[in-house]
């Protein structure tokens, strides 16, 4: 059997480094390429569509390999990281010319999904958050950081659901955990397709001390330690741009879980998963990348503190009413680059000359921005922002004096530093540019000094520069200055101290100039690094101004109005409100506004009307108006008086939960239960067609029970749309419920949607008319109409509005009889002939007959219906 080929020293070095990074692709620098070997090469060639070749092809065991050019490596790294992989970048860390034996190589950075900072990897207005989780004393410490900007937030979370909602909201791609986090939590995180990286060891460092100095809770300090330790291990450099950790409480903001944010399409379009057609798309007239990122954060976390909301409103109103100042501000903001990420590049040492010119350009526009805000700040509205508008003139002046206006991308190829900044560098540059002139001047000078007219200065690769004198003139040379260098047949070649100095200067000028320029550049970079906190503070102020001017611009263009918000009562009064995204897509002339009025004596609007008439749009319209108001923007209405809401819960649309494998109905019940268990009087509930995922009467019973529970126990403002017209009679027993419907009329057999909300219940659903609009065959529609008439004549089920939780004990027997009759009616409706039931079905039927639906809580009903469905679906 042939023996395996002995590894070369280079491959031994590769294997030693690879052992340290078993879970990452190792990009091993070899000349002008990054090479991958063995399994990395096989897998990498497939993912990156590279040619798989072999090293030592003639050996018994050739090594699979593939590679990418070093100058194009970032694109390939981005692809791997975007697919959830890690990439270890291994560089030559010594000059091959000076290496004794094998060139030393080290991993200089581990790029992961949560730490990628290259701009090409994502949009400028997107954050890339790395999160961390640590469990201690029955609490979860949770932290997240954007490595490109230095933003660092920390909190204490008490439930797994809250953790999952935060992870989804942050769109995190990677989370750092330690052994304190149990498998149940890890499995639920894995279901979100998030890369889990384990970091058990921690270290105290200057970065940890700085980041946690305002943090008091020990579990928060500990999670910061794990997070920063992981960053230092992966990035292998100082993290001087990390900001002080800011503690936040999810309860400080309007709470919306993942389902609510998804259903309301705040940041992502449900259909396309893109920005277009979302609230973010509507409100984004920001001019800077950092403003765009901050806008997303504000939309994701609306305020609940009235004073904070009013402070934003005042600034928006000020900007809105001063058009010329706002226009001037926008013109300045357009010229401000991404200060946050420029600061990050400075800290990482990846900043180049062009980045510094962007920084200088940005800083040069701050004085005018400051002047505009000062003009608007007579009443002190902008005091907090104004104080942070620091032009950082010392840094702007430094860059202006030192860096060329159009520098190259590379920081090692020269042409970075302006003439006059460094005398030594100027001499090198002069030597490069004027070497021939110097030599000509020296030649003339030596001829004059020696009286030798045919004396000449020459150059060859072996001896360098020399002075050549014919043998007949040797006696004219001074003895002390000329040193013999080479003897020819008819001449001698010499060098003088001055020529030797010029030779050294000329020959080394280019390389020395590049070295000196890089040294000067790194010195400038280090000076700027000392001012990173000032740059970050300025960036925050500019970003806030950008979002506020965006609100003012959108409010002006959309004719939005300043809402009156209060914590004194629970009344809601919106006149001629509209869904701003739909209106922008359709055009103002095509969209019909609607009022929403719910005073302290009205908690539930029961909405009926045809499909496609606008019930869901009306509900989303209210929720979006609340979000827009509580981020400090004006709202789409003619007038609006609103309370401050603490939470928004939605149950809109039908979608199976593919991650957990649960049905539409089960998802519906779970989402509904989250609302029922967590809502307060100050919450907003939006329920669309609750109960449609199960049998008709089961659904109707659930819907009625949920409405009554909300009305009698929670007292939250609730919009509940339904096709169960039988429920409209509930307004007789529930004094804080009102029926409304979306108007529609039949004309010449056609259905016309009025899209106007009207008082009272709808007379019917017009389902067959909607099917006609969808283009279903006439024959099918006629058959459906015939069946509908038959069903309506045979069934006369109505809700007994006198039944309520307060009277349940007196009507248990009646409920049992009605439940039995309803079940029999359902069986006769869909199975007119006798049906033979197995023992399991008979058992369930008996349970259904005996179930006291009106004596159960909504959650009890959900659980028992789910149990029945599960048992009936079992294959016997």
From Swiss-Prot:
Gene Ontology terms: biological process: mismatch repair
CDD domains: ABC_MutS1
Sequence positions that bind ATP: 609-616
Molecular function per GO: ATP binding; ATP-dependent DNA damage sensor activity; damaged DNA binding; mismatched DNA binding
Compositionally biased intervals (Basic and acidic residues): 806-817
Keywords from the UniProt entry: ATP-binding, DNA damage, DNA repair, DNA-binding, Nucleotide-binding
UniProt family annotation: Belongs to the DNA mismatch repair MutS family.
Protein name from the UniProt record: DNA mismatch repair protein MutS
Species, as recorded: Ligilactobacillus salivarius (strain UCC118)
Higher taxonomy: Bacteria, Bacillati, Bacillota, Bacilli, Lactobacillales
């Amino acid at each position: 059997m042939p023996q395996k080929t002995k590894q070369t020293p280079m491959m031994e070095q590769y294997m030693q480094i690879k052992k340290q990074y078993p879970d990452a692709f190792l990009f091993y620098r070899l000349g002008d390429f990054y090479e991958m070997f063995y399994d990395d090469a096989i897998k990498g060639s497939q993912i990156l569509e590279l040619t798989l070749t072999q090293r030592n092809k003639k050996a018994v065991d050739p090594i699979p390999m593939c590679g990418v050019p070093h100058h194009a490596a970032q694109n390939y790294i981005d692809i791997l990281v975007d697919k959830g992989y890690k990439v270890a970048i291994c560089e030559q860390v010594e000059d091959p010319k000076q290496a004794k034996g094998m060139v030393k190589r080290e991993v200089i950075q581990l790029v992961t999904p949560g730490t990628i900072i290259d701009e090409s990897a994502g949009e400028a207005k997107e954050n890339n958050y790395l999160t961390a989780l640590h469990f201690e004393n029955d609490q979860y410490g949770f932290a997240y950081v954007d490595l490109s900007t230095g933003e660092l937030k920390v909190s204490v979370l008490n439930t797994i659901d809250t953790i999952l909602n935060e992870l989804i909201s942050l769109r995190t791609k990677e989370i750092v955990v330690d052994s304190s986090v149990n498998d149940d939590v890890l499995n639920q995180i894995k279901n979100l397709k998030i890369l889990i990286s384990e970091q058990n060891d921690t270290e105290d460092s200057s970065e940890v001390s700085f980041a946690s100095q305002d943090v008091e809770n020990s579990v928060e300090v500990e999670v910061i330690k794990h997070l920063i330790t992981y960053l230092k291990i992966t990035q292998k450099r100082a993290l001087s741009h990390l900001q002080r950790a800011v503690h936040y409480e999810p309860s400080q903001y309007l709470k919306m879980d993942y389902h609510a944010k998804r259903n309301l399409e705040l940041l992502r379009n449900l259909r396309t998963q893109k920005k277009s057609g979302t609230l973010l798309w509507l409100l984004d007239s920001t001019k800077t990348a950092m403003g765009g990122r901050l806008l997303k954060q504000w939309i994701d976390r609306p305020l609940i503190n009235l004073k904070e909301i009013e402070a934003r409103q005042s600034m928006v109103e000020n900007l809105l009413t001063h058009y010329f100042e706002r226009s001037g501000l926008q013109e300045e903001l357009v010229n401000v680059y991404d200060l946050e990420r420029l600061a990050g590049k400075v800290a990482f040492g990846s900043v180049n000359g062009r980045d510094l010119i962007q920084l200088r350009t940005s800083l040069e526009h701050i004085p005018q921005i400051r002047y505009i805000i000062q003009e608007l700040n007579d009443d002190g509205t902008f005091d907090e922002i104004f104080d942070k508008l620091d032009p950082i003139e010392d840094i702007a002046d430094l860059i202006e004096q030192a860096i060329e206006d159009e520098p190259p991308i590379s920081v090692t190829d020269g042409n970075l530093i302006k003439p006059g900044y460094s005398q030594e560098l100027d001499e090198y540059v002069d030597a490069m540019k004027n070497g021939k002139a110097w030599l000509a001047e020296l030649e003339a000078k030596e001829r004059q000094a020696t009286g030798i007219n045919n004396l000449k200065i020459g150059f060859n690769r072996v001896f360098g520069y020399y002075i050549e004198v014919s043998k007949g003139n040797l006696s004219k040379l001074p003895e002390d200055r000329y040193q013999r260098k080479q003897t020819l047949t008819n001449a001698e070649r010499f060098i003088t101290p001055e020529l030797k100095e010029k030779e050294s200067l000329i020959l080394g000028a280019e390389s020395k100039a590049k070295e000196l320029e890089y040294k000067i550049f790194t010195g400038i970079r280090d000076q700027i690094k000392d001012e990173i906190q000032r740059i970050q503070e300025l960036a925050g102020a500019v970003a806030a101004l950008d979002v506020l001017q965006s609100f003012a611009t959108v409010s002006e263009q959309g004719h939005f109005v300043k809402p009156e918000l209060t914590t004194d009562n629970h009344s809601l009064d919106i006149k001629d409100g509209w869904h701003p995204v739909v209106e922008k897509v359709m055009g103002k002339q095509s969209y019909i506004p609607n009022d929403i009025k719910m005073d302290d004596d009205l908690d539930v609007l029961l909405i009926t009307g045809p499909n496609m008439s606008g019930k869901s749009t009306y509900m989303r319209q209210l929720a979006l108006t609340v979000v827009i108001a509580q981020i400090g923007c004006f709202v789409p209405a003619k007038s609006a008086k609103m309370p401050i809401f603490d939470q928004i819960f939605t149950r809109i649309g039908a979608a199976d939960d593919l991650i957990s494998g649960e049905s539409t109905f089960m998802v519906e019940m779970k989402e509904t239960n989250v609302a029922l268990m967590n809502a307060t009087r100050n919450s907003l509930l939006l329920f669309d067609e609750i109960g449609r995922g199960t049998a008709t009467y089961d659904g109707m019973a659930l819907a009625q029970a949920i409405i009554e529970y909300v009305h009698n126990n929670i007292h939250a403002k609730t919009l509940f749309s339904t096709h169960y017209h039988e429920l409209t009679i509930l307004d007789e027993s529930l004094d804080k419920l009102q029926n409304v419907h979306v108007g529609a009329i039949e004309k010449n057999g056609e259905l016309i949607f009025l899209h106007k909300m009207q008082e009272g219940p709808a007379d019917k659903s017009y389902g067959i008319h909607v099917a006609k609009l969808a283009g279903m065959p006439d024959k099918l529609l006629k058959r459906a109409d015939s069946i509908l008439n038959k069903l309506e004549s045979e069934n006369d089920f109505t809700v007994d509005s006198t039944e309520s939780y307060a009277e349940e004990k007196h009507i248990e027997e009646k409920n049992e009889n009605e439940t039995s009759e309803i079940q029999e009616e359902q069986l006769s409706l869909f199975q007119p002939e006798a049906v033979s039931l197995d023992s399991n079905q008979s058992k369930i039927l008996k349970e259904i007959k005996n179930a006291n639906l009106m004596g159960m809580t909504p959650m009890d009903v959900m659980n028992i219906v789910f149990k029945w469905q599960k048992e009936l679906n079992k294959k016997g």
